[in-house]
Amino acid sequence: MCSSDLNDVSLSIAPGQKAALVGPSGGGKTTLAKMIARFFDPQEGRILIGNTDIRNIPKETLMDKVSFVFQESRLIKASVLENVRMAKPQAMREEVIRALEAAQCTDIIEKLPDGIDTVIGAKGVYLSGGEQQRITIARAVLKNAPILILDEATAFADPDNEARVGKALAELSKGKTVIMIAHRLSSITDADCIYVLRDGEIAESGDYDGLIRKNGIFTRMWKNYSEAAEWKIEKEVRA
């Protein structure tokens, strides 16, 4: 497929697989993810779900098949219940509660004055970036679509929330086809296939072990990531 940001990109993800898209900013990762949701279509080529071109699938049907957790969690000024129920308007209250529990949101709900009926953004009630992400994950849990797209899903998670976000994502991903975009390379070592995008093209692909053995772009990315992580740990210890 081709677009203004992608050039001759071809990949195949089997049902139930976890695929990771990595690479420098501007490499085409988010563009590719948004094409799957038909935020826009490729100028050339096509995207298939099964054997069906997604342009031939009604948008409502396509949206039923895909859930997203994006970089910027978007919560509306409404109750937690209403924010989560956006993904499935007919959901019962008990379903929403179960989704929140699966998304590791119990601690959030317990501290809110009116529990899941608390209006976010009203009367000084605000959530941190990581807490908002967990509410967004609860939406995806409730929707339970077979395809899951995670775009920098832990980007705004503070240290206290990162472990909970990771656990929530692991629960959410069970039994689904997952397409994950991440800079935190430690989160994608278990991916069935990792695609390294650079300048709108797939520069390398393979599983973690195979890419490390190639000693190419991904290996350099991993070394840089590991060194940065070690520096952060050392800095925190000294502090």
Region roles according to the model:
Residues 4-239:
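ABC-type nucleotide-binding domain
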